[in-house]
Structures are given as structure tokens and as C-alpha cells.
Curated annotation (Swiss-Prot):
Lineage of origin: Eukaryota, Viridiplantae, Streptophyta, Embryophyta, Tracheophyta
Similarity-based family: Belongs to the GIP1 family.
Tissue: Expressed in roots, leaves, stems and flowers.
Superkingdom, natural source: Eukaryota
Gene: GIP1
Alphabetic keyword roster: Chaperone, Nucleus
GO CC term, one of those recorded: nucleus
Protein name: GBF-interacting protein 1
Biological source species: Arabidopsis thaliana
Short name of any one Pfam family annotated for the protein: GIP1_N
Amino acid sequence: MSRISGDGGSRVSIPADLLQTIQNIREVTGKQHSDEDIFSVFKECFSDPHETTQKLLYLDTFHEVRSKRERKKENLVPNTQGRGRTGRKNFASSYTDASNGRSAAFKKQSGANHIIGGSGTASSAPNNARNDTKPSSIMAPNPISLPSGISNQKIQDAIISPVDKVDTEEQPLSKATSSSKDVVEPDKSKESSVSVAVSDSVVENDTQYAVVETFQIPQQSERVIKSEVAASKCKNESLLKSDVGERPHVTFPVHIQVAKMLENGLTFGSFDSNFVREASSDKFTIGCDDSNIESSHGTAASARKDISTFSQDKNHEISNSAAQNELTLQPDQTVLPEEGSEGDKVKNEVLPITDTHQAAKCDAPPISYPDQYSLAAAQQAMHLYRQQYSLNYFPYGPYFPPYYMPQPYIHQYLSPNGFQQQSYLPPGDDAPAPPGAELPLTHIKPGSDIGNSPPTTIPFSYTSYAFNHIPSAATINATHKEEKKENMYTTGPLSLANLQASPMYNLSLQGQPIAFPTMQAGIRGLYQQTQPILAPLSISARTEPIGPSHVTNQQPQAARTNLGNNY
């Protein structure tokens, strides 16, 4: 059971199970709204009584809900958007625009104005339709000379009629650009464009049209050139009119060079997600400057006479000839082959692809860029402080000394630790002496061959640490003439006995004493003199007693060091 309620001639059937809910909402809101209004808001709120109550409470009570007649007038003039009973712009409610679901097309269009000047009229797919394929935007501009007896309305009805028969989903024309006003608004050259959403795969196969004869005109190539020359004065305003006054302009940085046509026309929100997906999936937009609409196999012909291809132009150079039918192409540009008869010659416009996937407008003049046109590349993203070293460098060398760092990785320290350590010696001293070079041994003079010979000292650049270098006399068996000089040298290796003795070495030699240098005059008792080892006496076997000999090799005993007078 349902209840019929309404005011102002409108009849709305309310289900019986919702009568109690609507009655409760009406009591909460103060009985200021009719059942029809409450039911309309209830459907808009997706059958949520709480949201319906809140929405009705925020509505202004000083204005009555518009009647059905007023809503019909509003739908006939879609220039003015309903703003609710409050008149507030910030209240996002489509309640006043909905006439119980009958004007859903106007509500879903979000206020898009589809008004066409001239003799053309705008048409779109049905509201309750579903379309699985992406429609191609087909626009047929004037001037087109038609035979007598055939009007634009008949042609339009013939094109739209198969679409009305198919269950296709609504594809608003405002999705192609930022506003549908771009698509349908005529240019200054008085070219009216008819925008039709056509899907080739969903049209029935038994429809045939006589539209082919009306559009196949042998003199269209000349008319296209004339229309392009006339439209060139518009400076491609069709791409730049998308809500210029309402939305802020895009400000380009100084280092980015853009075309002059985009400096004042590109605004925020010019391209939505559907537009980018449409351009990226098809890779080109099918327009029809001089559309040759043909009906073959029962399909509503998609006009593909003027195919604007997106090509990758490295030099951004395009040579367009507006006065002739020839087009000069760069080596890296491609143009799809033409369809139709040979008499219909159409000049293909080649546009460079851009990062924003801009679709070519069908009634736009050819775009000509200056020679050697270049776009400055965007600056590469850098760190905030612009680190001049790579990320794997470790700039904490002074705090973490690389004692255990392997050699291949020590270069990553930004400190002296990572560089090769220089020698602390003078440049000439740290180099090894070549073989055979003379080493000046000063104060070396031949002495007596009595006792054990003291070691031969070689002066070097290091300072004395625990001992003093005291040159002493040495006995050297001179066999060469140069060794008899005052300064003598030797090229043989030094043995352990020739090292300068010092308590720092902590050596204990067996069978021979350690030779200490000569005692200094100022420091007594610190060193002891070398005691020579007496040679054993040669005694004949007759007189040699049995037992140990009376004369033995006496080992030197270290004397006590007298340090009392040295400080």
C-alpha cells in the first residue's frame, strides 16, 4: 500500500513501509515540510533517516520548497543553478535541482551549460544509459552546404536515433575538457559544432542512413582551408576558454619556456582524470573538420577524415602550410592514412605531444611554432643543502679514527685519515740509499786490534730516544784503498754485534759480551768500559794439569749505576 502525497499538482507515491519513518522525521523537524519534500530528501540521503533529519533542519524555514512548476521552469533554463532554499553557495545540496529523479540529467551534469549558438543543437546520450566503450568526440563544423530539403535537425536526428535505442551509460560531455562550454561554444568564425557521443560497438546493425550523401561534398578541401584561415584569427581560443575568469591561472616559473597560447589560458583543474585517461589510451583524438559520415554495416559512422595524431617531435618544429594542401613533415612524425575517396583531400594537422596529453580541437587552426623551439627542462630535484659529496661518504673522520677500517673503504673519510700519510722525515732521508752509495762515517779511524771491537755506528735522522750516539774507535780490516781514508764506508749488512748496545734492546747474547760505548766524561757510572776477553794460553800437553784451566773467559758484570750525582 502506498500513499499519494503532493502539493502544487505534483503526485509522489510513498511506500507504505516508509510512512512511519517520514512521519517521525516530520515530527522531529517541526512539521515544517511536506511528505513529498521529506521523501525527496530521504531518497537523496540514500534512505538514511538521520542524515535526512539533519539536512531538513539546516534548510531555511522562511522559504517554501519550490513547486514542480517552478522546477520545470528551472530545467528549461539551465543557466541558473538552484542553490536551495537558503541561497547559500557553500551548501552542497542537489535537493532543489532534483524533481523526484526526473531531472537527474541536469543534477548529474553539475551545472554544465550545453548551449550552442547558431543552427546546431547539443545532444548527449540518455541519462539512464550504460556504455562499455569509450565514445569518440565527433564534431561537424560549418560551413557545410547541404542539398535542399535536408536540414541540420534531420541529420542530427539520424545520428542520435541509434544511440537512443541502445542501453548505454551516460558519458557527460564535460569530461572531455574542463567544461562542456569548450566543446559546444562556437568560435568567432561562426562555426557551429555538433557534439555527439557515439559508440561504434553498441549500435544496432539494421540501421541505415542517408547522411552520406549530404556530407560528401567535392569542394570541401577548399572550404576547410578557408575556414582555417578564418579561424586562425581566433588564436585557438577554444583551448583557452575553460573557466578563465573563475579559476586561477597557472603561473609558470621563469626558467620554463612555454607557448604563449598556454600562458594565459591554462588554469587549475583544466584536465580531469577521464580526459587524461582518454588521451593516453587512444593516443590520438578523432575530430572531423570536414566529416565524412558514412553508414556501413549499420553503424553510425565515426568521422575520421581529419585525424590529429600525437607524434613525438624532438625538435618541436612543425611546418604547416595553410594555403596549400601539402604538409611538410619532419622525419620523426607520422600521419595515419586517410579514409574515403580520393576527391576528398584533407590536410592532416600534426601536433607535438605534450606532457599534459592535450587533445587537438577539431576546429582549431594549425599550430605553427618558431624554428628551433625548445623547452627548458625542469631542474632536477636536489637536496635542500645541495650536498657536494655522494651519500656513501662518512664525514666524521676526526671523531671516528679508522683504525680498523680496510683500505678500500678508508677513502670515504672526509679527513686526513683517508689520504696517504706523508713521511715525517726530510725528502732525502726517507728514500732508501742505492746500493754502492757512500755513507759518510765520520770520526771513524783505524785503531788497535786489542780486545773486542766496539760496534760501528751509522748516524740517521731520528733523534736519540733512550741512548746517545757516541762514535767510538773501530778496527776495520782495510783491504781496499778507499777504506784507508779518514771517512770509510761499508756496503755489507750489519750484524747483531754491530748494533749499538742499549738497555732498551734487552738482549742477552751467549758467549760474547755486549759492547757498550765509551763512557762519557760528564756522566760517570752510567756506562762501563768494554773489558776485553783474554785469549787462552797455549800449554803443551806434558805440563797441562788434569782439570779446569786457571785462566777462564771472564764475563763482564754490570756495575751499579750511580744516579745520585746526575740530577
